[in-house]
From Swiss-Prot:
Keywords: Acetylation, ATP-binding, Cytoplasm, Nucleotide-binding, Nucleus, Phosphoprotein, Proteasome
Organism classification: Eukaryota, Metazoa, Chordata, Craniata, Vertebrata
Binding site for ATP: 190-197
Protein's name according to its UniProt entry: 26S proteasome regulatory subunit 8
Subcellular location: Cytoplasm; Nucleus
Family: Belongs to the AAA ATPase family.
Family annotation (PROSITE patterns): AAA (PS00674)
Region (May mediate interaction with PRPF9): 186-406
Modified residues (Phosphoserine): 120
Keyword Iron-sulfur: no
Length: 406
């Protein structure tokens, strides 16, 4: 059907309007894509600008620090009032200095390291305490799993060390009520293998204190003054983590008696011991810092180290008697798969003069004999052969090294 002239014109105008609309819509989409792209570029540039501004700010702060005058490092003695502090600066001496308004006076505690301005001696920064990484490694992170129940034949020693170490830490009010000073330290001495280190680990387990273990040989350094510095930092770390226990094993390596003569190495060891004596006199017993020392040679220790006030109690660890050896055998054979009828008392009688470590070694050797014969249980014969192996005292054992290696 043919359309009239006006209708035909309206149809053509509608088609033209529809095409024009599609054209403008496509243009709008293109422009929108361009706007989105430019917006994304703008955001990226803003992020880069913020990053560069942060770098500039850090560089300005670093430049300001580099342009600042140097500071003196001192140690706080005590606070005089709300605005003044007594500070010890080595080697100049002690000074009463002002505290910067940005520093809270409550944060300025005795023995903390601070920075003083070079021109006015104003305290403007609190510094962290300086501790050698080697000293930090001496702190035992994991609490030892040894308990008093794992120690046999040392009931008297356990009671004494509880009175000196555990009781002051858990119940200091008892000593205040009696009006007596808390003990500072204890010395464990006796032959090797009698349980000194084991008892120290059990004390650390039951007191729930920071346990710092150090061997005396670790404090012997080749450079002058290094050993004394490590001793100072050891006690600084103990004060920071109080309540704490410092266990010094093999103390005879630095605590031997002083002689008139001696080489340079001996004088350095003596210097380390003098610093240890100074620290034992310097820190207060009420600060919850206890010292446990262990040695096999109490006869060579310096008398200045053993006097009361430094070492308040000396606990002897003798070789276990028959009953003690029986208790140790029961403890170490508790988890072993034993056959019925094993007479542990007879085994204890076969080991006169044996140490606790040797008794434990007998249990281990008995298990090795059973393992060698592909058995899953240990017999009385295994224990007897283990005793014969561990306790053999023939003539070869007493030979000198020179004869032994000929």
């Amino acid at each position: 059907m043919a359309l009239d002239g006006p209708e035909q014109m309206e149809l053509e105008e509608g088609k033209a309007g529809s095409g024009l609309r599609q054209y403008y819509l496509s243009k709008i989409e293109e422009l929108q894509l361009i706007v989105n792209d430019k917006s994304q570029n703008l955001r990226r540039l803003q992020a880069q600008r913020n990053e560069l501004n942060a770098k500039v700010r850090l560089l300005r702060e670093e430049l300001q620090l580099l342009q600042e005058q140097g500071s003196y490092v001192g140690e706080v003695v005590r606070a005089m009032d709300k605005k003044k502090v007594l500070v010890k600066v080595h080697p100049e001496g002690k000074f009463v200095v002002d505290v910067d308004k940005n520093i809270d006076i409550n944060d300025v505690t005795p023995n903390c390291r601070v920075a003083l301005r070079n021109d006015s001696y104003t305290l403007h920064k609190i510094l962290p305490n300086k501790v050698d990484p080697l000293v930090s490694l001496m702190m035992v992170e994991k609490v030892p799993d040894s308990t008093y129940e794992m120690i046999g034949g040392l009931d008297k020693q356990i009671k004494e060390i509880k009175e000196v170490i555990e009781l002051p830490v858990k119940h200091p009010e008892l000593f205040e009520a009696l009006g007596i000073a808390q003990p500072k330290g204890v010395l464990l001495y006796g032959p090797p293998g009698t349980g000194k280190t084991l008892l120290a680990r059990a004390v650390a387990h039951h007191t729930d204190c920071t346990f710092i273990r150090v061997s005396g040989s670790e404090l012997v350094q080749k450079f002058i003054g290094e050993g004394a510095r490590m001793v100072r930092e050891l006690f600084v770390m103990a004060r920071e983590h109080a309540p704490s226990i410092i266990f010094m094993d093999e103390i005879d390596s630095i605590g031997s008696s002083r002689l008139e003569g001696g080489s340079g190495g001996d004088s350095e060891v003596q210097r380390t011991m003098l610093e240890l004596l100074n620290q034992l006199d310097g820190f207060e017993a009420t600060k919850n810092i206890k010292v446990i020392m262990a040695t096999n040679r109490i006869d060579i220790l310096d008398s200045a180290l053993l006097r009361p006030g430094r070492i308040d109690r000396k606990i002897e660890f003798p070789p276990p008697n028959e009953e003690a050896r029986l208790d140790i055998l029961k403890i170490h054979s508790r988890k072993m798969n034993l056959t019925r009828g094993i007479n542990l008392r007879k085994i204890a009688e076969l080991m006169p003069g044996a140490s606790g470590a040797e008794v434990k070694g007998v249990c281990t050797e008995a298990g090795m004999y059973a393992l060698r014969e592909r058995r899953v249980h240990v017999t009385q014969e295994d224990f007897e052969m283990a005793v014969a192996k561990v306790m053999q005292k023939d003539s070869e054992k007493n030979m000198s090294i020179k004869k032994l290696w000929k």
